[in-house]
Amino acid sequence: MNSATDSARPHDQIRPVEIECGYLESNPASVLYKSGKTIVLCTASVETNVPPWMEGRGKGWVTAEYNMLPGSTSPRKRRDRSGKVDGRTTEIQRLIGRSLRAIVDLHALGERSITVDCDVLQADGGTRTASITGGYIALSLAVSQLAAIPELDPPVDPTAVLRDSVAAISVGVIGEDVVLDLDYRLDSAADVDMNVIMTGSGRFIELQGTGEEATFDDVQLAELLRLGKIGIAELTKLQKAQLVTV
């Protein structure tokens, strides 16, 4: 059934995904992540220190920054001025950071910081979910590179640092249909939209569901979650396939 999408894509199918690891020569822990027409560049950078409030606690920190380039949307999105970040950007980068930290053992990381930067090059809906899914791949690449440094003290065990994987997808209710992976057009038409963030092992990290001048019932919620799980499972397979080849 594709009546809700009015397109060739079935309501329970994700958009085409393309992943290119090592996209930047300057940072091997970089990922160009494409979900349909949405394109996000995710990079992970490691520092050998932690924020002042975490010093001496024997654990590391993972955080994220999110930004949309002016040309990523039409009309042009204005740049944040003088380092000031707007409310939407703050909310999204906190979500990305929380989602990534949920699967990281900060003690196993040691007193090191990893910043995952997610820069939206082109936006067509789902930029925050694409940032989380691509950001995890960049994070995994950075942790693997740390582990490859023989003189590192203490050493890093990737399997200890990364306890699981994480991916995110959007779902929504449009008319009578529940739809997976909303692009901008579908998101604009949705009566209800939800972001589903889950681990690769099938545990929930965060759910963000909202009715737009509408409500939804238990049956619709169950279907939203069912489709979300389908999408997460597919994205997890794609993540694993990419990381195996790196």
From Swiss-Prot:
Region described as Disordered: spans on this chain: 67-87
Reaction it catalyzes: tRNA(n+1) + phosphate = tRNA(n) + a ribonucleoside 5'-diphosphate
Domain of life: Bacteria
Keywords, alphabetical: Nucleotidyltransferase, RNA-binding, rRNA processing, Transferase, tRNA processing, tRNA-binding
GO biological processes: rRNA catabolic process; rRNA processing; tRNA processing
Pfam families (alphabetical): RNase_PH (PF01138), RNase_PH_C (PF03725)
Enzyme Commission number: 2.7.7.56
Residues binding phosphate, per UniProt: 88, 126-128
Entry keyword annotation includes Glycoprotein: no
GO molecular function: 3'-5'-RNA exonuclease activity; RNA binding; tRNA binding; tRNA nucleotidyltransferase activity
Family: Belongs to the RNase PH family.
Protein name, UniProt field: Ribonuclease PH
Source organism: Rhodopirellula baltica (strain DSM 10527 / NCIMB 13988 / SH1)
Gene: rph
